[in-house]
Amino acid sequence: MKVSDIAGALGLKLKGPDREISGVNTLEAAGPEEISFLANPKYIPMLAGTRAAAVIVSEEYAGQVETALISANPYFDFGRTLHLFARPQGSFSGISDMAYIHPEAEIGGGCTIYPHVYIGARARIGEGTTLFPGCYVGEDCAVGENCLLYPNVTLMAATTVGDDCVLHSGVVLGADGFGFARTEYGIQKIPQIGRVHVGNDVEIGANTAIDRAVLGVTTIGDGTKMDNLVQVGHNVTIGNDCLIVAQVGISGSTHVGDRVTMAGQVGVAGHLTIGDDVTVGPKSGIARSIEPGKTMGGQPAVERDVYMRTLTVMPKLPDMYKRLRKLEKELEALKGESGRDS
């Protein structure tokens, strides 16, 4: 593949001589037949020393390399380039005789079903979808077209997944929500009889669990991307194009709007509303609803400017405490002297 081929595939302008490209790498590690990219200005000094055959850059830096692909969004276009070089997922094709497919299940054309997959009654698998070994698709489930379910993904009964979704290993959709009642007879389970729906173009990271609703539907909106080890409680609604980073926990019946970003280890209490375009910093604890467009951080979470001022003050607290104690003692001494004088 030549640089001109990549430029044509991505619709980018080529500056400089055309070259052969055999792979993709970082600026530092790239060899003379690899393409790289510059998205972060702090790596500009690496342009002078890179051995890369070509670099995807914004127009302002194109003059610093011999061969450049000029991009308005170098990181995004680098991702598109990776698709051109990505290795095929597995060598198997077709439907394995060692998969169990219920007679009432429907399998679309061009699907790949690996050995040891289970597909239950009335389940539907859309065209071009791949299920790797160990996947479980329960009865009445529906998986859309061109989806990729990595090994050991579990879809419990009546779960629905849209088109172009990627579910990484260990994902569980539709397990019972954490519903229990304390009674005089002990802790009693509340049956969870709802389901989970995942929209189109959703990616869910390894070992993430999204619980079925008590009644109704737990919903993940179109275009949302979730990292590994995320927990979504029953009856949660997550909007479109959200980014949910690792170890986030969202408690039951909370509504998350569109384009929300939650950094790692955010905890969200139940029955809240998180507005559109909210950003929440890492390790934050959300205990109340948040208006659209806010940036929050801390435990409990407050608006970013308040949180940053708090972080600035916290290292000074031990010294401030010592000074306060000293002032208190001096004040007590002055009171004592004043009492003796009277």
From Swiss-Prot:
Enzyme class: transferase
GO biological process, any: lipid A biosynthetic process
Coiled coil: none
Pathway: Bacterial outer membrane biogenesis; LPS lipid A biosynthesis
GO molecular function: N-acyltransferase activity
Active site: 234 (proton acceptor)
SUPFAM superfamilies: Trimeric LpxA-like enzymes
Pfam families, alphabetized: Hexapep, LpxD
Top-rank lineage group of the source organism: Bacteria
Keywords, alphabetical: Acyltransferase, Lipid A biosynthesis, Lipid biosynthesis, Lipid metabolism, Repeat, Transferase
E.C. numbers: 2.3.1.191
Catalytic activity: a UDP-3-O-[(3R)-3-hydroxyacyl]-alpha-D-glucosamine + a (3R)-hydroxyacyl-[ACP] = a UDP-2-N,3-O-bis[(3R)-3-hydroxyacyl]-alpha-D-glucosamine + holo-[ACP] + H(+)
Any one of the GO CC terms: membrane
Statement: the UniProt record of this protein carries the keyword Transferase: yes
Oligomeric and partner information: Homotrimer.
HAMAP family named among the record's database cross-references: LpxD (MF_00523)
Protein family: Belongs to the transferase hexapeptide repeat family. LpxD subfamily.
Function: Catalyzes the N-acylation of UDP-3-O-acylglucosamine using 3-hydroxyacyl-ACP as the acyl donor. Is involved in the biosynthesis of lipid A, a phosphorylated glycolipid that anchors the lipopolysaccharide to the outer membrane of the cell.
Protein name: UDP-3-O-acylglucosamine N-acyltransferase
Gene behind the chain: lpxD
